[in-house]
A protein has these predicted regions:
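Short beta-strand/loop motif that positions the catalytic acidic residue
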Residues: 78, 84-86, 90
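Catalytic active-site module of serine/aspartate enzymes centered on a nucleophile-bearing elbow/loop
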Residues: 108-140
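Glycine-/small-residue-rich active-site loops that bind phosphorylated ligands and cofactors
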Residues: 52, 90, 127
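Alpha/beta-hydrolase-fold enzymes
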Residues: 1-52
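Short alpha-helix in the alpha/beta-hydrolase fold that links the catalytic acid
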Residues: 80, 94-103
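Short glycine/threonine-rich loop-to-helix capping motif typified by GTGT followed
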Residues: 93-94, 125
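Active-site nucleophile elbow and catalytic-triad environment of alpha/beta-hydrolase enzymes
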Residues: 52-74
Length: 140
């Protein structure tokens, strides 16, 4: 489908179920666990267009696939410590693919936040405290 989209010059068209930014309030289906943090970011997005994000386009998807293929091919060349923070309830990123990636790294460390959605940095206070502690401990 990405090839067809390229031939038809759909580079900037949104993928199915993806759209440009709207100011629709939808905490329940967001990638955020903390309503307070969601509300804060929501207000920032409404008030300032620089905070706004759009859905994925065919161009974005092609670039992501290209980057993923490159990383898979060159994973053994990564010689630095890598911390992978994995959201247990992520619906945007494949935890299986992340597991395969981190397992191939000689200095790979994985931390899982089982109750978190994609935006771990917008999780509940307990998860966020562990998340930041894990990051600081990793670099200590």
């Amino acid at each position: 489908i990405l090839f067809v989209a390229r031939v038809l010059n759909w580079n900037d068209k949104y993928l199915p179920s993806q759209t440009q930014y709207t100011d629709e309030y939808d905490f329940e289906s967001s990638c955020c666990l903390s309503r307070a943090r969601y509300d804060y970011i929501y207000k920032c997005k409404v008030d300032n267009e620089r905070y706004r994000t759009n859905g994925a386009t065919y161009r974005w998807c092609r670039a992501g696939r290209k980057a993923s293929k490159y990383i898979k091919k060159h994973v053994q060349e990564i010689k630095i410590p890598v911390l992978l923070c994995q959201a247990g309830k992520d619906t945007l990123v494949s935890n299986t693919a992340e597991d395969e990636f981190i397992a191939k790294l000689p200095q790979g460390t994985k931390k899982v936040y089982p109750d978190s959605k994609h935006e771990i940095f917008n999780a509940d206070d307990d998860t966020l405290e562990k998340f930041y502690s894990d990051i600081l401990d990793f670099w200590a």
